A protein has these predicted regions:
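Solvent-exposed, acidic/polar segments of extracytosolic/periplasmic ligand-binding ectodomains
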Residues: 170, 174-230
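Short, well-structured alpha-helical segments that form the helix of a local strand-helix-strand
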Residues: 158-175
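A structural signal for well-ordered alpha-helical segments within the folded catalytic domains
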Residues: 64, 141-145, 160, 187-188
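Extracytoplasmic ligand-binding site segments that recognize negatively charged/polar headgroups
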Residues: 1-13, 89-93, 138-144
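Short catalytic/ligand-gating loop segments at beta-alpha or beta-beta junctions
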Residues: 134-142, 175-182
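Extracellular/periplasmic Venus flytrap/periplasmic-binding protein
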Residues: 1-73, 111-116, 120
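Extracellular/periplasmic periplasmic-binding protein-like sensory domains
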Residues: 69-141, 152-157, 205-229
Length: 230
């Protein structure tokens, strides 16, 4: 979508992919206004470009329209399609039996956890709310956990004390231990990555794995380069 999130997501993807595969060529881009996508026109434009693969960052109702039009017109056939956020229950569930097959996505496969902290969180959430968690539920819970942890470490609600306490703050979460890095206070929470498929009339993630943020975040040297004045 044509706003900061979409622009940043595409820029980051291009940078990372070019670092891994310098000869890759980006042959077309479509920038629909957020929640105002003309999916038919967008799909036609992409099809005319004949890409080998597609990187999609639309979500919500835009994603539903794009998937429907793209499937109807055969856009995704024979093409690897990547969908940022497309495996998150908030966006995958509404697609129901129209969910795409074989997209590589980030998401939250709450239905496949068999044991451990992830399973414990899902069970507790379902018992409390009589519904399954989404990625927003997980992030919200981890945010509260982090606030509690930093207040306990700081021993104060003073802003400076909290700032200092966030450096190398460790938190035990449903996805495992995370740390807020000293250099930028960025958490090392990672992402679940897998492929979409249909199961029981709805979309799910399969062949997924959890990628630790610490394995992918910018190095200290890169962080310093990005800071104004450096």
């Amino acid at each position: 979508p044509n706003y900061a999130y979409g622009k940043d997501a595409v820029a980051a993807f291009k940078k990372a992919l070019l670092a891994l595969k310098p000869d890759v060529e980006f042959i077309a881009e479509q920038w629909p206004a957020v929640f105002k996508i003309d999916a038919g026109a967008e799909v036609q434009a992409i099809e005319r470009a004949k890409p080998d693969a597609i990187y999609n960052v639309t979500f919500g109702p835009d994603l539903a329209k794009f998937v429907r039009e793209g499937t109807t017109r055969g856009l995704f056939e024979g093409r690897t399609t990547y969908g940022l956020l497309s495996g998150e229950p908030e966006y995958l569930d509404p697609l129901k039996d129209e969910a795409p097959e074989g997209w590589i996505v980030t998401g939250y496969p709450w239905y496949d956890f068999k044991s451990g902290p992830n399973k414990d969180f899902v069970d507790s959430y379902q018992a409390r709310w009589d519904n399954h968690p989404g990625i927003g539920s997980l992030v919200g819970y981890m945010t509260v956990q982090s606030v509690v942890a930093v207040l306990e470490k700081a021993g104060s609600t003073d802003s400076e004390a909290i700032r200092v306490a966030f450096a190398d703050l460790g938190v035990e979460t449903p996805v495992g231990p995370i740390t807020f890095r000293a250099i930028d206070h960025q958490s090392t929470m990672g992402a679940f990555v897998g492929k979409t498929t249909l199961r029981d009339g709805g979309g799910v993630m399969v062949d997924w794995s959890y990628k630790k943020g610490s394995d992918y975040l910018p190095s200290d040297a890169e962080v310093m380069k990005l800071r104004p004045g450096n």
